[in-house]
Amino acid sequence: MAEERQQRGRDRDRNREEKIDDGMIEKLVAVNRVSKTVKGGRQFTFTALTVVGDGEGKVGFGYGKAREVPVAIQKSMEQARKNLVSVDLNNGTLWHTIKDGHGAARVFMQPASEGTGVIAGGAMRAVLEAVGVKNVLAKATGSRNPINLVRATVKGLSAAQSPARIAAKRGKKVEELNHG
């Protein structure tokens, strides 16, 4: 029943998902109307925040501005495809707990067991689903500004490292990490 209910207002376009022929998952996070007052009246422009991912560890976000919504979305999708970063995943979840932030937005992400699902809100959910995380517990604190939440989430995910990468950095084997 909840799925059948139509969303109203600005939530209507939030987290809209499309799969394009290149296999990338595109999610529209937010569309905003901006007004500039000039001598002849108001000029309206639109901004779009989108997230693009391959569902297997790559994710990027883009922010586009234009006089019309479709053009703003297209610009932001192009920018998102140019800004892809790699994320180390562990069977559909994270390797370890992640805390990060951008501006006043703070994010906390924790690995979860199989069957948990993506427990995250708003802009964080779009990023986590696009990158291919299937099970995670996440919480946003501080500012809920979608742009800063997306930036903080991508920054935290890209800083996360697998045990194999940490061991290679230290010149050790993975088995030696916990023992000394």
Curated annotation (Swiss-Prot):
Any single GO BP term: translation
A molecular function GO annotation: structural constituent of ribosome
Pfam family, any one: Ribosomal_S5_C
UniProt keyword Signal present: no
Gene Ontology CC entries for this record: small ribosomal subunit
Domain S5 DRBM as annotated: residue spans: 24-87
Record key words, sorted: Ribonucleoprotein, Ribosomal protein, RNA-binding, rRNA-binding
Keyword Membrane in record: no
Domain of life according to the entry: Bacteria
Subunit structure: Part of the 30S ribosomal subunit. Contacts proteins S4 and S8.
Function: With S4 and S12 plays an important role in translational accuracy. Located at the back of the 30S subunit body where it stabilizes the conformation of the head with respect to the body.
Family note: Belongs to the universal ribosomal protein uS5 family.
Domain notes: The N-terminal domain interacts with the head of the 30S subunit; the C-terminal domain interacts with the body and contacts protein S4. The interaction surface between S4 and S5 is involved in control of translational fidelity.
The protein, known as: Small ribosomal subunit protein uS5
Gene name tied to this protein: rpsE
